[in-house]
């Protein structure tokens, strides 16, 4: 059973979950959240995010102890999955040893499951490796885990580790590469092909980011590169006869994938070859539970289809240049407003792909959810940046493979402030948006213009649009 729905801990919600002890989720609340996602919402996988977040490493023990009836009927590791996202030591030096601790924790979780199920069941047997850029990074994680397992035969003073501490299980784990940059996305097919040649896995799961590519290169480029990567994966699957199951990391706004309960059919149409779709915090908590459950059922009932073929248009580079030029103009405004965007998860001081603050084209910017929230809060949805670089014909050509392009732009344009755009020096963008004759939400835009002036209510705006960031 390969999951269709992965619940994640991305903090893009404005509502506080009913079970939360604090607006900032962490610790015990995330244990409850995992059970809620499995038992109520119908998710068949929960990401457990060790990458830059404070999470409970005894999650398996606590889930089995607190909800024994549910997990006797729904076996963790067979019917349901718990999948850690681990730090990538090639990039995250400050968190590197946490990878070792997390891999050791997999064997400990298996011990708890053995006692609970009276059987050798591995509740965790896969890890997500963020910011993957090479085959070597994947193989290192495999090899490190094998070294941990091989310790069982080592003699410590007068006894083997196996006799003293017990056997290490599972013997092998799967590594799920998470591709996040343009270069990584576009060479993902080659990396996967090499990996299959070396490891000969029964199947492979591959994770494609949608949010960070959008922040780095713009919405249209992000969709283009992710779709090209999905096409490459399909080709490798056909060549090698190895089943490959793509995962896509989608959030609520179109900029981050457009995954909202009322929009799931469009997301399925946009990414038909994806096996596993993420549902993030806004999806779970900013909508009526019945709507969330229904949307999850729609995804789980839909069969995968072939990926869409496409050629990357040459003019996409010019769009990226314009997008990044506009980011430079907006960076001071983003840094000013981001302090007003509330936290929704407990985070460590994070050293990620671009550090705690993402670095885009030499600019220091917040992480993507707060980045998105900041721009929406001043009436400049990030979906629209760089749009003025493209002609109508060029947009039409993109819409041939980006099926929801015009719907996504129409959604974002409802929250666009012509006044703010012209005030910050984005007159050309303002003129381009006017050509679409958008149906502007006047109440929203008035409040966004107040926020731009240092007043206004950013959470009122989040409620109107339906997500934080």
Curated annotation (Swiss-Prot):
It catalyses: oxaloacetate + phosphate = phosphoenolpyruvate + hydrogencarbonate. Its cofactor is Mg(2+). The keyword Lyase applies. It is an enzyme of class 4 (lyase). GO terms for molecular function: magnesium ion binding; phosphoenolpyruvate carboxylase activity. GO terms for biological process: carbon fixation; oxaloacetate metabolic process; tricarboxylic acid cycle. Its EC number is 4.1.1.31. It comes from the Archaea. SUPFAM superfamilies: Phosphoenolpyruvate/pyruvate domain (SSF51621). Pfam families: PEPcase_2. Signal peptide: none annotated. Keywords: Carbon dioxide fixation, Lyase, Magnesium. InterPro entries: PEP_COase_arc-type, Pyrv/PenolPyrv_kinase-like_dom. Catalyzes the irreversible beta-carboxylation of phosphoenolpyruvate (PEP) to form oxaloacetate (OAA), a four-carbon dicarboxylic acid source for the tricarboxylic acid cycle. Homotetramer. Belongs to the PEPCase type 2 family. This is Phosphoenolpyruvate carboxylase.
